[in-house]
Amino acid sequence: MVNRFSDSEIEALISEFGINTDVERVSLKADAELYRIKGKEYCCFIIDSPEAMQIACRPSLVGDEMEKLSGALAAKAVPAILEAGAIKNPIIFEHILRASLGYHLHDSLINERKIFQAWIRTQYTYPSYKDHNEPEKTIVSTFEDFSALDSCPQGAADLVVQDTIASGKTLEFSLGRIISEAEKRGIVIWNLVLYGFISERGLDYIWNGIKKRGIEIHAFAISNLTPLCSNNYDMPLYGPDESLYSEKGIIKNIGGAISRQAFERYAGLFIPGLDQPGDFSARLSKLYNGKYFEDSEIPVHLKRSYDYIERIAKMLKKERPSLYSKTSGR
């Protein structure tokens, strides 16, 4: 069931949740829609397509169907990224395991350019699902393979990373490792290309660190540049911050960046407050751990998503009954 909002209701949502629609369409030959977000020191784009909207709005999309749509989206994204001029040098592609392969950008990019694939798996020293706040949660590397850098030409290189970027802490750690390994081999990273579900706060955090190294950023966010909930994990398009409400009973409205036209489409399908990527790795068919493929945890993701949606529904029904009536039954 898709409920449609009137123009006045769309404007009210944009205003109430602080949704940033100050974006400009980039004219491309590629199939994907590309929008540039204004007012950033770095190049920040939104990549949108029917596949992107399905992945963002349907947490029940998992397994082979999820992989198929993700691959189709990546096949549209690569021409857009290249046409936007984001890649000019030899390409180092860093996979942050285990979710990386599920974005499938490398599968399409490798058909267009030679890439040197590096691998790293990180983990928090304490369980981190829906909780990236605790200062004692440090990140460590449990697997690394940078051997492909031995074949990469010395000099300037572009670094491509596909991942879910929430707080940016995991990415920060992974970037530090590969930049260090590249420098040992006479390789200088000039440009960082990011692709995936990306939060604005996490991206700003990465930029504030990476610009000190003189590295440029071209970020390509799937569907929208998201806000980040108070747990530094959930990445909705818009809605109340569910984690803050559950913890402290406080209603805080948050919204991301998206084109006005795209928001009209998404508003009819999206559950306000829903974490768009979910536990992205758990939505995939198989997970590569650096040595072999292992089963994902699809049932765990589905149960968590169901419970999450139930909490959102109860919150909206109590605090925002008019919005609940528009979005219930999805």
What are the language-model segments listed below?
Residues 1-330:
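PRPP-associated nucleotide enzymes
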